[in-house]
Amino acid sequence: MLPRVALIDPELTLSLPPDITATTGLDALAQLIEPFVSAKRQPLTDAVCRTGLPRVAEALRTACTDPTRLEAREAMSLASLCGGLALANAGLGAVHGFAGPIGGMFSAAHGAVCGILLPGVMEANIAAVRDRGDTETLRRYAEIARLLTGVADVSPEAGAAWVRTLVAELAVPPLAACGMTPADISAVVAKSKQASSMKGNPCPLADDV
């Protein structure tokens, strides 16, 4: 189903608790990063990702620590909208490819799972595309790092490090908190291979990554 009109009203999010603000915000961040490096990326989705990423960087912490700051809520609402437009047209990647099975197997908030997985998937993808000589995707990860950190000369890995720090600051619970153990990893990996989101990942990932 597709709506004729979508009304995005940031004022409706002012009462959202900090923990839900954090996890939904991290989901929005993942939905901006994954389409930007997706195998199905395109210029129009690039543009909306470039609009949304710096807004998350500027506003998510504030929206969590000062929930009534309307300008932060406005920025996050726009970033979330941009992520929705991007994923609908360019797909996602391994973060959401893993998050779907994990959410189905355990009682875990989707945004929390995405936030925990995001930096590790970014690091794995960066290493994989570097090994494959995919300079364009590597350049895109470096651009993500610039958009998130505000620093002009940064490595692709700096974006993943920035996300990891953010997730820690927002006190997102680890996957173990929902009951997942190392023994469950093989089942998650097997199910993730059937996830449509995996088709958008910029490169195949080995099972042991």
Annotate the PLM regions.
Residues P35-N89, G100-G103:
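Glycine-rich phosphate/diphosphate-binding loops and the adjacent beta-loop-alpha structural elements
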Residues L29-I33, M76-G84, L118-M122, V163, ...:
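Short alpha-helical scaffolding segments that buttress acidic/His motifs in well-ordered protein cores
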Residues L81-C114, A195-K199:
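Glycine-rich phosphate/pyrophosphate-binding beta-alpha loops
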Residues M1-A6, L26-D27, L53, A57, ...:
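Acidic-glycine-rich active-site phosphate/pyrophosphate-binding loop
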Residues T181-V209:
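Short, amphipathic C-terminal "tail helix"
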Residues M105-A183:
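Gly/Pro-rich interdomain helix-loop hinge
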